[in-house]
Amino acid sequence: GIAFDAAHGASTAVTRGDDGAFVRGVALGLFATDPSWDYGPLVDEIRSRGATDVLVVVNAYQSARFASDIALRPGRSPSHRTVARTLAQVHEAGMRAALMPVVRLERRGPRDWRGRISPADGLDAWFTAYRRFVLPLARLAEQQGAERFVVGSELSSLEPYHARWRALISELRDAYSGLLTYSANWDRVDAVEFWDALDEVGLTAYFPLAEGHDRPSREVIARAWRSPRMQIDALARRVGKPVLVTEVGYVSQRGAAGMPWEHSATNALDLHLQQRLYQGFCDAFAQTPSVSGFYVWNWFGVGGPRDHGFTPRGKPAANELAKCFARAWAAPAPVGNNR
């Protein structure tokens, strides 16, 4: 495909599997209640900001933390046809496409989330159900020529069963020929023991920044990124693979710096803090060769100046991201053998 540079009206070729090109990406959750919803206009909005990549996100659901009944749910999950069409629209818009399957919980207690899944009927049942969810999506990604596939997202409690993950990754390699990664939670990434089976280290970068500051300045945010950036550099060196930031995102609310993962907060609207947090992330990583790129979480949503959520649509953050994407980013350094 052709990557469109909105800042200069120029275009640069990007080809499938070209992991030497820095990923300046945006996640697009297929979260509409209509399973056949057309995400084409949102894809075009992302392209108009100068992004080179889109991470298409597909939610499946299991009934609760102790369950194993993973399935695409009508009214909450897209159809396979919609996923295929969206991947095609990303390529038609001149961007690279990645696909990330995510498991969510239908019923959850206050501390329940997918990182604490503990299947009551055993690991065999859960991994069988998970395999039924992700393998068809990997085949679909292969058919559509998607450049990347994320084998899992933030399944922290299940990561220690690395032999099962290795078996699944091997099966995914048979079905899919592009780049494979896994998306680990920022505080669990060092504990994952199957990075050697993947092409990139993936992490969600919801590091707590500037705790105790409701409205931190650009300078405070820049200082807060120093330690996480050193951790990421050390991780890339230890594993011998580049680090892909599979999610980085902020709600447009006060307090977003201290707990960036908190999606249900109801604090005062703060559009400019969201903008500064993206500015700070881009300041921190523009010249970091251990990082192969990032995806902003997440374009889907109403957006606009009264929206408290993650989406940058129609907010100052969207203009900040356009500037961020147009920067000169360091090419990922070869830190080791990919396979």
Q: Regions from the language model: what does each represent?
A:
Residues 24-28, 52-56, 97-101, 149-151, ...:
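Hydrophobic faces of well-ordered beta-strands that scaffold small-molecule active sites
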Residues 79-80, 85-86, 93, 100, ...:
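Glycoside hydrolase catalytic-domain groove-lining segments
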Residues 27-33, 67-80, 119-131, 152-159, ...:
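The substrate-binding groove and active-site-proximal loops of carbohydrate-active enzymes
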Residues 133, 148, 158-183:
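Active-site neighborhood of glycoside hydrolase catalytic domains
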Residues 2-46:
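Boundary/entry segment of secreted carbohydrate-active catalytic domains
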Residues 49-68, 82-158, 253-256, 297-302:
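Substrate-binding cleft and catalytic face of glycoside hydrolase catalytic domains
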Residues 4, 9-17, 260-263, 273-280, ...:
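Aromatic-rich peripheral "rim/lid" segments of glycoside hydrolase catalytic domains that contact
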Residues 33-47, 127-140, 185-194, 275-284:
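Short, acidic/polar
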